[in-house]
């Protein structure tokens, strides 16, 4: 049995009711279909609001990153602490006591091992960090989540920011995840300005997140060779394909997806077909898709928000998959690691690649 790869702990004061809703949002996200392709036990989500003692004012049980687990149980490779910053918790930390010691221990654990322990503040009430003991302890740590609390947009941003932060903490991603925006400027007879409007909307939404962007028209510098620049960027970034009517028929669009898949990079498709495709392409198979819809002639912003969330989920899945592979290499398993570790990427584009490692299990 492999030790857990990622454990997410949602910590909040029982008096801050929004903490329950944040916890439920994260439980649904990390236990849902988005992460169902990982080997069992890769992700666990725990909620820590209640006192660990009979004292109702007491703090929750210590986390494994603070106090070692009994019986030699191994800690997870990555620990993400989601601290819901509400007014009740801020008030409790004003005076010395078990909750202040508990939150201080979380901050100390992050400071001692920031490559494996992350602290992600979710500020659900304004001014909780302003000239408070709470702010002194954790206010210097960049939080997650944007927008009005309890809205769908806020919940989506919390999930996306958390997944991005964990992926970057896993050291399998650059300091900032970069989105390679793949699209075609060739339009069908009925698309007109709709495609450019959608691409602009996607770019605006990326700009409103903590994600970086590679967009060929702006990223490739004058006097640079654009072909190798695009190949290199597609092999290093998380690829978001805006699939319009002519997308699958464009050679360079297929090439960009092919480069990303061969490099093992995440790929997600935003389906924005108006009439449909006259031809398809096998290189676009086996990747998550999100439909883009028009309402009164305007692209729905929520569809773009959803596809960016799915793309970041794929980035985190890639990090966790590789962590599992690294850990499994050092333990005795009843199956050959070469078999299950490569199932994630068994596709024709990889088989045709001369660098693709051959599996020892026959198919």
Predicted regions and their residues:
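Conserved N-terminal substructure of TIR/SEFIR domains
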Residues: 1-86, 94-100, 111-115, 127-129, ...
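Short glycine-/small-residue-rich Rossmann-like dinucleotide-binding loops
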Residues: 85-87, 244-245
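Generic beta-sheet signal
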Residues: 122-125, 242, 270-272
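Charged, amphipathic alpha-helical linkers/stalks
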Residues: 277, 282-284, 290-328
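Short glycine-rich, flexible loops that bind phosphorylated cofactors or substrates
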Residues: 89-91, 247-249
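Glycine-rich, charge-decorated loop segments at or immediately adjacent to ligand/cofactor-binding or catalytic sites
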Residues: 126-141, 226, 275-291
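Short, acidic/glycine-rich phosphate-metal binding loop used to engage nucleotide
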Residues: 218-220, 245-248
